[in-house]
Amino acid sequence: MERLRLYDEALRLRRGGLGYKRISKVLRVKYDTSLNPGAICNWVKGRHHPLRRCNGIIEGPELAYVIGGWLGDGTLARERNSHKYYVKLSVKDYDFAEEWGRCLAKVSGRLEPYVPRWEDALERWVVKGSNMLLYSLLRRARENPQILLPYLERYPAEACRGFFDAEGSVWRERYQVRVHNTDPRLIELCKQLLEKIGVYCSIHKRRQSKLLKCPKTGKRYHRNSEVILDLAIYGRENILRFAEKVGFTIARKQSELTQLIRRYERKLNLIFP
């Protein structure tokens, strides 16, 4: 885990404009460890990665999708007795849980996919897998989601698909695709990734009720935040590009997106019959 921390810090310092030798000196002073400037260069250039020597995480589009989905609907759990470190997803849609479980298995080097299980208490499909390295990475990302950028920016479409499967929706009446979250850091990260594939959006704030009522028990809970952020994608070209590059794994959301595109086509036919 220490090497991952060095990797994150090295990339952060490089983005701040420091040279490789200077980064090596800073890391030596801060972490009391010696790291060759050449190794730092290989990290920055993407030639090497500290996780590639471990079988715990396999980088690729599946990892980007897993992280994107987890940022929206995921949790972490640890079983101290068995030393299991679980990455979990709890969702309403089976097709989302199924795809996330397949990708999590691929990330972990597992041949068989993780299978979603229905939990009556949650009224959700739950899928989980034990992966200590991914658990550690996501735990640190709670404090600073930007440390995930090196894993996501090579596969921005898959990362966004995971996040939109978790938090996204289609608003046909307003001709928009939207994603909602209370954490401005996650919304900004999503915006960065969308722009990498040429999809542009705007961010709006709105207030929500302080209390949340559980539909099953009727109990009321205090929300963590009274402000929710909406990232909105609109405009025909943006919507079409989103549909082509990103889309949804969830069938009901993909159907809504298809209907929105058809509305655009009908509107265009009325203007140019």
Regions from the PLM with identified roles:
Residues M1-P273:
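Internal intein/HINT superfamily modules and their associated LAGLIDADG
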